[in-house]
Amino acid sequence: GQILLEGQRIDQLPHEQMRHIRGRKIGAVFQDPLTSLNPLYTVGQQLTETIQTHLPVTAAEARKRAISLLEDTGIPAAAQRIDHYPHQFSGGMRQRVVIALALAAEPKLIVADEPTTALDVSIQAQIISLLKRVCQEHGAAVMLITHDMGVIAETCDRVAVMYAGRIAEIGPVHEVIN
């Protein structure tokens, strides 16, 4: 198989070229938001570093964009919370920060690997809804990796069913699930 992004094959690119694609063209949201964030840095430091690494902006512009992303993802009092550390946020709020981080460099694709597994059931639907909304607003496609068929049925247009590392079935959600 091949992995194509915007018509370019990326599965055989050298490490250095992939480094430029990761973050800039592809963002990621992982299972556990606590391990996705560095506990030694504020969420603002992490967001602004990502923004400045991938976009030609000043530190002030990066901070303004970071606050805007936190607001977009539903972090209350984002201008103050930007200076907080990951441990000062709840699990759901940390996952919102991770989603903001994934969107920081305006990627074309967000890979969301079980983004709600580590969260309370009451927060899971909010996070899936948020991910869908902000990706639509920012023009990013989402590749959702999950075992939750309910989430797939409610969220996805197309689905690929994997078995033993291979695609066993692929197609529109309503056809594959039925």
For the regions a language model picked out, list residue spans one by one.
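Conserved ABC transporter NBD signature motif
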Residues: 1-9
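A short, surface-exposed alpha-helical micro-motif characterized by mixed small hydrophobic
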Residues: 152-154
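ABC ATPase NBD coupling module
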Residues: 10-27, 45, 53, 175-178
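Helical segment within the ABC ATPase nucleotide-binding domain
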Residues: 125-139, 150
